[in-house]
């Protein structure tokens, strides 16, 4: 029977990417870098809703992207919940367009990590200008490709080795720690808020089973926009109660 062809861009030239953006040489200090300790307790799920307009108002008042305003608010809330003054957060960027494969159906992303230092009197306006500048720098095509090359170089080198799959998996995990993936929380935005509602988005906000687990972080926060309401789908591996109250 006839099937509709699935259109996907061909694979990008990883060897050319590695040649253009060579990975820095690893040293003894690379293996000894400090890595944030993440919680690995039983997963608990929380939904938090806020109006899209309230987030936009916060962003406009501070002259930053809504994404940055949300990240800043989460950092302030999680300081009390996690009991830490230094909060590390990570996010991923879609690199398909920058890599010249806009219709790729395979995974084509890079990840960035930043940290923010907080105190008792820290306000949103104190932290979001620097956070926003960092986000804007990292989302430039050249910066995304360079980061993607550095993160893929580890995968590329390990894949070339003649070793059992279980050994490669362990080495991949070590590479994640070296590249600084672990964070207090991951933040991602699902869907395009300018497009009409889709069944997939509606299902996502209700079905825990389709949420993305927070690998490499104490919690994963996925924000989706639907009918003027932003839903935060949070999977939390920290043992402390009271996350929802902290976010309010």
Roles of regions detected by a PLM:
Residues 5-11, 19-29, 76-85, 195-204:
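Short charge-dense sequence patches
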Residues 79-248:
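Acyl-thioester-dependent acyl-group transfer interface
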